[in-house]
Design a protein with these regions (language model features):
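Solvent-exposed, conformationally flexible loop/turn segments
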Residues: 123-125, 173-177, 238, 300-304, ...
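Intrinsic, low-complexity N-terminal interaction/targeting segments
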Residues: 318-341
Length: 393
């Protein structure tokens, strides 16, 4: 039944993408809901295929400092290369304007996003407008959580009685462009008694599992009305970090056969449903990096820091629970002081921290199998007297 439902949704999305391809060249979604006055924040984002390396340094950068072969899964020894960590993926990447000629560089504060798509920011009362160009080889979409969307800007195909114009958002065909319009009402922002921001996600939803395992997921941060700087960041924070405790299962990505063919020659040699093969191609990452290979997360003693933490969905529910743990510091999560949180699939959490203990500290998943698989990184707390290295957000 599950496989049948997935096939049905994928087929509906493919039909929607094909039917609207000519009209999608630059189709602006019509936001039917009344919007409150505010800024229109426009993002030019392309879905693109490129290579991604989970271990760019070739070894552990957080614990041992050595190159290792932890990926030699029992049953796969001698057949699969434990050092093969570069895979073809799809990514959301931001451009400077509608020409899609110049990539918008990430600021030093946000280089740690890694594999994730660009951060979408807005203040309550604003409108987010995403111009999505599909440069990939198959249909993709963009579906947001939390913000307001009409049926023609949902980015998801299912039996909802919509047709024609209201289906063009469901799947953007290769080579086509579609504009999603998402108003940001008060219910998309922080609730009474919460902090200055709310945290949501966006992702492709043509086939949610395969799209996300391919790499198409990113963050949305909404700031309370009156609390945002010009760029949308909250005035009451010094640093923000987004961390995805994400299990990327390459055997469930659209590009698995192509990756196996490139790595090993004949894709028919390996059965993607074989347990050993699947486990070998699962990567326990933080923002797409293993073993501390991402940028160092740096803050100063006394900074007002907010962590936005989430986890990916995956077919293996037993692997979907993560327990991020900060060494050396404590944080406040949902009005409770702690140094660890628990996440279920696609769950988001925010943790407020005022670091008081300078040093280099471990940040990792406490599930033993995930920690052993490389789901850890480091963060640095500099003494309060150290000049800020990343002024602004």
């Amino acid at each position: 039944m599950r496989a049948h439902a997935r096939s049905m949704f994928t087929a509906l999305a493919l039909l929607a993408g094909a039917a609207g391809a000519s009209a999608q060249t630059h189709h602006a979604a019509r936001a039917r809901s009344a919007t409150t006055p505010g800024r229109v924040r426009v993002y030019y984002i392309a879905a693109e295929e490129s290579d991604w390396t989970y271990v760019p340094s070739g070894g552990d950068q957080a614990i041992t400092g050595k190159k290792d072969d932890y990926r030699n899964v029992p049953g796969a020894r001698g057949e699969l290369d434990p050092n093969a960590t570069t895979y073809r993926k799809a990514r959301f990447r931001e451009y400077t304007d509608s020409s899609f000629r110049t990539l918008k560089p990430r600021s030093p504060s946000w280089e740690h996003l890694g594999l994730l798509g660009p951060l979408l920011r807005a203040e309550v009362g604003d409108t987010i407008e995403v111009v999505l160009r599909n440069r990939a080889s198959r249909p993709y979409s963009m579906h947001p959580h939390g913000v307001l969307y009409a049926k023609n800007a949902e980015g998801t195909a299912y039996l909802d009685s919509t047709r024609d114009e209201d289906r063009r958002d469901d799947a953007v065909a290769p080579g086509a462009t579609f504009t999603y319009v998402w108003p940001v009402p008060e219910r998309a922002g922080p609730a009474a008694g919460d902090g200055s921001t709310a945290f949501w996600l966006y992702h492709s939803h043509v086939d949610e599992g395969r799209d996300i395992n391919a790499g198409l997921i990113g963050p949305i941060i909404i700031t309370r009305k009156g609390m945002a700087r010009a760029d949308g960041s909250p005035k009451d924070l010094d640093r923000e970090f987004v961390t995805d405790f994400g299990l990327f299962d390459e055997s469930l990505s659209w590009y698995f056969a192509a990756n196996v063919a490139r790595l090993y020659g004949d894709p028919s040699r390996f059965d993607s449903t074989d347990k050993a093969v699947r486990e070998f191609h699962q990567f326990f990452t933080i923002n797409g990096f293993l073993e501390g290979n991402g940028p160092m997360l740096t803050m100063r003693q006394g900074d007002r820091v907010r962590w936005y933490v989430f986890t990916n969905p995956n077919e293996q529910s037993a692997w979907d629970i993560h327990s991020p743990h900060w060494h050396g510091q404590t944080a406040v999560v949902a009005h409770m002081r702690t140094d660890m949180i628990m996440l279920t699939p696609m769950m988001t959490a925010m943790a407020d921290m005022i670091p008081d203990n300078p040093g280099i500290w471990l940040f990792h998943c406490h599930m033993p199998g995930h920690f052993g698989g490389g789901m850890y990184t480091r963060f640095t707390v500099l003494p309060a007297t150290t000049p800020a290295s990343h002024p602004g957000q």
